[in-house]
Amino acid sequence: SGYSASAFLKDQIARGELSPADVAQLTQAATRFGLGSLGFSAFMAVHAQYLAGRPEADYIANSERLFRRAIARLIYPEARQLIEAHRAKGHSIAIVSSATPYQVRPAAKDLGIDDVYSSELEVIDGQFTGRVVQPTCFGDGKVLAAETFTEAKESTLADCFFYSDSTDDIELLEAVGHPVVLNGSRQLRVIARERSWATAHFTSRGNASGSQIFRSLAATGSLVGSFLLGLPLYALSGSRRDSINFSISLFAETASALIGLDLDVRGREHLWNHRPAIFMFNHQSNADMLIMASLVRRDIVGVGKRELKNMPFIGPLMGAAGVVFIDRSDRTAAIETMRPLVHALQEERKSLVIAPEGTRAPTRKLGAFKKGGFHMAMQSGVPIVPVVIHNSHDISPKGDRIFRSGTVHVDVLPPIDTSDWTTETLQTHVTDVRNTFLRALAQPELSVEETLALEEHTPDDLKPEVRGQTNRQRPGRKTNLSDDDPEQMLQAPVIKNNQPAREQNNGAPEATRH
């Protein structure tokens, strides 16, 4: 959904790499290309000149950052389903794109696609020369790239599916045996009807409708309403705990209904068999708070970033519900702030809900775990219950402004005994617990050494302590609610896909072997 080139251009402007005159020249070139008076290779050359002398390694690192920040959320969940459907049939998959590899490869890596064909920029001695490698992967060049792929797989284009939304790809659509027009332009849809090509339309990304926005605002407001409705219970019973439990359950039911969120839960019995417990969940989405409220329901405390405390209405309500706000940029202060949670676990018999990653992951890949929750488990002696959330990223990916209605699949795993844990063995236990998540998510497990290396090499934009420092340094900045507000409740259509003949053109395969 959308164009990765836009994210790159906006980033270059924001970083001061393009002057107003440069932007004007690029805009003029894009306009001429759109009108057909400038060829694709010439259009690419206009942009490539601005990279001359720049180290490729820096551009690669920046492209990966941009993917995490702005592009990952654009990948259609239906596209992921489609890719898996092709894999299940034993098909080989490639991305064949006119974009540069720096736009395409991060998405390919996230999707598990090794074969990438794109328009290359010339690099000598690790630096861009400002020239484009010919031929570019456009028009007949894209056909040539697809033929290279099929030859390597000992197949032919006649066996291939190819998915596209643009008439720019008409040459390859005509060359393959199974052309599919996906979210096609009006002109391409007309051509598809004339030639009896398969068509499909994905709807789970894009602009929210008025109805979706209204329902989302209502769901967000239901948090306030749910706690207000709990006040009469508190007045009558005098029990703050019963009032909060009532409000949490009411919020979970109301907001889920408004959003259209359903949960498919395996191992639900583990939510209740060993309380109090520390419920650890992998953090993918703004929807996770609602999901955990729906699952755990009562007698809970939580941990949230300090920035949430100052949010109007939401912050005070979260504090009243037992959320402890921590300063992610100050490890010592964070540990001190969390000490009362041991009392809540041991004396008040409340359970702790915590995301060991410390921040939302931009993709489905499990991030590095922080040790705070594990220290809490060791000090309190309560078990850890892993809650594996499979696809809340589909419902509302990091950085998105809306929620999508649909079904989230959750595995609640058996409790893990922590009574014999020690400081000396803690890293081993962290690795073991993280590997239980990885197994459930069908991702490769890591050794202790590999787990430590992952923590060390986690990019700064995925480290909550670094993000916290950034927020402290810029206290007056305007907050991007889609990045910082886990209370946003927006929704969109249910994801349904049963056929391996659907795909999308941004971050998804464009050629597959049948």
Task: List each language-model region with its residue ranges.
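Active-site neighborhood of HAD-like aspartate-dependent phosphohydrolases
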Residues: 1-35
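Metal-dependent phosphoesterase signature
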Residues: 42-77, 254-255
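Membrane-interfacial amphipathic helices and adjacent loop/beta segments
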Residues: 55, 241-268, 298-347
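Non-catalytic C-terminal accessory region of glycerolipid acyltransferases
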Residues: 335-514
